[in-house]
Design a protein with these regions (language model features):
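Transmembrane beta-strands of outer-membrane beta-barrel pores
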Residues: 13-15, 24-30, 38, 62-68, ...
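Outer membrane beta-barrel strand-and-loop segments of large Gram-negative receptors
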Residues: 1-2, 88, 94, 109-172, ...
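Surface-exposed extracellular loop regions of Gram-negative outer-membrane beta-barrel proteins
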Residues: 1-35, 39-45, 49, 54-101, 122-137, 166-175, 250-264, ...
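Residues on the lipid-exposed face of transmembrane beta-strands in outer-membrane beta-barrel proteins
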Residues: 5-11, 24, 46-50, 101-107, ...
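Outer-membrane beta-barrel signature, preferentially recognizing the C-terminal barrel domain
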Residues: 66-117, 142-153, 162, 269, ...
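C-terminal beta-signal and adjacent terminal beta-strands/loops
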Residues: 237-315
Length: 315
């Protein structure tokens, strides 16, 4: 169960505006072994904006964020991965705070044909819960553990180019440098994530293509390699109905691996149906009565913690 309270204050002075907020979150957990956990965390934040003109703006966000252990990582049960290789929860895990800062710039041309948004992000974790491999006799145990002094520096760039009304190109690039030390190794990782989207929008038609290049994520001692994937779709809209066709190509969804002194392993996801997946969609829209919505005031208190972790989730 989760309770969340949030309050903020906003003001504007000429081209400048700011927002100061404070959130309070209380989490209640009960594991399968009837162990109970109660975590109370604070989430303060500051946002500064400057609107140079109608084409460009800059935003700076600073926050002290928090992360709460999920149920699966707290459960002190053992899952067999392979012979002499196990995963086990850690009941000693605690919530942790981390410092987050982001500087974002946005520019849009007067005619709406060009948009660019570069940003720089830095996060510092005095300590962070990360998956670590431990040697216990002849066995290897994968367990979440507290890792000190985790640094993350990132940059991103997204573009939107619309030379004509019915054609849009949307490339993006993300970079992140992470560094920390586990009991097994010093990690210095460079993440490169790039992709592009193309849209053709002639009259009632919508044709889209998206491609994402391979990338490798790191978390503690564990690396995850995501393969190249792409999708293409065509949609035709007529009055209150639409019919479309989508094609997904994702032959190598992910590969999880680790390599430490005296031990290495890899686990690869193989979903052959995603090598060439085709789906057909038909939609009919109808409305009855009146509806009212306040999109800007909606909040979400949904809790998606199923208690599952990577090790005990079907692949």
């Amino acid at each position: 169960m989760k309770e969340y309270v949030y309050a903020d204050y906003s003001n504007a002075i000429g081209k400048f505006s700011y927002n100061i907020g404070l959130g309070l979150e209380n989490n209640h957990y009960k594991t399968a072994t009837n162990e109970r956990f109660n975590y109370l965390v604070f989430r303060p934040s500051v946002v500064l904006n400057v609107q140079y003109n109608k084409h460009s703006a800059m935003k700076f966000t600073a926050a002290i964020n928090s992360s709460v252990p999920n149920v699966g990582d707290l459960t002190n049960s053992i899952v067999t991965i392979d012979e002499h290789f196990y995963s086990q929860g850690n009941t000693a895990l605690k919530p942790y705070y981390y410092y987050y800062a982001n500087l974002n710039y946005q520019y849009a041309s007067d005619n709406g044909k060009f948009y660019i948004a570069p940003s720089v992000t830095y996060s510092y974790y005095p300590n962070k819960n990360m998956p670590v491999l431990f040697t216990e006799g002849d066995d290897i145990i994968l367990r979440m553990a507290k890792i000190d002094n985790v640094h993350s520096l990132g940059a991103s760039l997204s573009l939107n180019y619309k030379p004509v009304n019915w054609f849009v190109i949307q490339p993006f690039y993300n970079y992140e440098y992470s560094t920390y030390r586990t009991p097994n190794q010093v990690v210095k990782h460079n993440l490169h994530n790039a992709g592009i989207g193309v849209q053709f929008l002639p009259k009632n038609w919508q044709l889209m293509w998206n491609g994402n290049m391979p990338m490798t994520l790191v978390d503690g001692d564990i690396h995850t390699r995501m393969g190249f994937n792409m999708s293409a779709s065509i949609l035709y809209k007529f009055k209150s109905m639409s019919v479309g066709l989508e094609y997904i190509y994702n032959p190598n969804p992910s590969k999880i691996y680790a390599d430490i002194n005296g031990f290495s392993y890899s686990e690869e996801t193989k979903w052959n149906n995603f090598k060439n997946l085709v789906s057909l969609k038909f939609t009919y829209y109808f409305y009855k009565g009146k509806s009212r919505g306040h999109v800007g005031k909606r909040i979400s208190n949904s809790d998606k913690d199923s208690g599952l972790i990577n090790i005990n989730t079907a692949k």
